[in-house]
Design a protein with these regions (language model features):
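Glycine-rich anion-binding loops and their surrounding alpha/beta cores
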Residues: 34-37, 61, 76, 98-105, ...
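Active-site cofactor/substrate anionic-group-binding motifs, chiefly glycine-
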Residues: 19-83
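N-terminal glycine-rich anion-binding loops that anchor highly charged ligand groups
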Residues: 1-26, 33-43, 269, 275
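Residue-level signature of catalytic and energy-coupling elements of molecular machines
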Residues: 11, 56, 97, 152
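Short beta-strand segments at enzyme active-site cores
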Residues: 7-10, 79-82, 189-190
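Active-site-proximal loop->helix
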Residues: 86-102
Length: 304
């Protein structure tokens, strides 16, 4: 807390201008984790998954990663999602969950207990990285993606060992993948060529696959999953309340009414991204899974 907001912003912009390196980001992430309120390990759980994005893609889409996390947990894989309020997007994961009525103010022990019982829990970043409150004003005032956007996905307080990570700023995607690989996290870092920090359904997606421990860059196409002519505008979100309403409709069993087409599109996006997160989790217990083409690994988890 000794740096002024101007100094913090200047530090972030300096890194942004020169280009963040994996070594720099790894040191920043390690320092954050050193001072974090870590979530205790859950006995008997081998894979803990995070489904998270950097935000800042400018799409103002619904919270696909948060909904995908619910699907992953429903498939029997433990999820401990790390997230925050919106800084450079309309609605952050914390904003959505709060609008849905969830209590964000949980201790690290409570997060572990919820994950053990429910199979899914949420780490609200300020509760686990209290020092980051000093960076929040500068980050908000900057209003553009910076190193702070990528530090969140790299500093899951539960030390998740598998992840699907969306990265809106393409130069930072390989940096994130290398940092995660160096820590042994089986991760897929993704960025749609349309700018989405998700696996896109309307354009090819660049993937930095770190599930083998090495980083391999590949490309996924919507046609790989039988998706043609998808309309991205159906993924547009708005306020936390609107996104919460759409989330209820995505998981509800009732007729979504006027939102039927939108909800169907969101469900498809959620299913695809959840399948990718499950593919990342597969490699925790089965390293040989990485020898299978990624599109095939994802397809095995898609409903037919």
């Amino acid at each position: 807390g000794q740096a002024t907001d101007a100094q913090t912003a200047a530090f972030a912009m300096g890194l942004h201008i020169t280009g963040e390196t994996p070594e720099q980001v790894a040191v920043l992430a390690a320092t954050m984790l050193e001072f974090a309120n870590l979530v205790p390990a859950i006995p008997g759980i081998s894979a803990v998954v995070d489904v998270v994005g950097t935000g800042g893609d400018g799409s103002h889409s619904v919270n696909i990663s948060t909904m995908a996390a619910v699907v992953v947990a429903a498939c029997g894989v433990t999820v401990i999602k790390h997230g925050n309020r919106a800084f450079s997007s309309s609605t952050g994961s914390a904003d959505l969950l709060e609008a849905l009525g969830l209590d964000l103010d949980l201790s690290a022990d409570q997060v572990a207990a919820v994950a053990r019982i429910a199979g899914i829990a949420f780490c609200f970043a300020p509760n686990h990285h209290p020092a980051m409150r000093f960076a929040a004003p500068a980050r908000t005032q900057l209003g553009i993606p910076s190193v702070f956007n990528i530090l969140g996905p790299l500093t899951n307080p539960a030390l998740a060992n598998a992840a699907l990570v969306g990265c809106a700023h393409i130069p930072l995607a390989p940096v994130m993948a290398r940092v995660l690989a160096s820590r042994g996290v089986r991760a897929l870092v993704v960025r749609g060529t349309d700018g989405l920090d998700e696996i896109s359904l309307s354009a090819p997606t660049q993937v930095w696959d770190a599930t083998s421990g090495e980083v391999v860059q590949i490309r996924l196409d919507p046609a790989d999953f039988g998706i043609i002519g998808f309309r991205t505008e159906h993924l547009l979100g708005a306020s936390p309340e609107r996104n919460a309403d759409l989330t209820r409709k995505v998981f509800g069993g009732t007729d979504p009414g006027a939102d039927s087409e939108v909800v169907a599109s969101i469900r498809l996006a959620v299913a695809l991204n959840a399948a990718a997160a499950l593919a990342a989790a597969d490699s925790v217990d089965d390293p040989n899974a990485c020898s299978i083409p990624l599109s095939d690994r994802i397809n095995t988890h898609l409903p037919r």
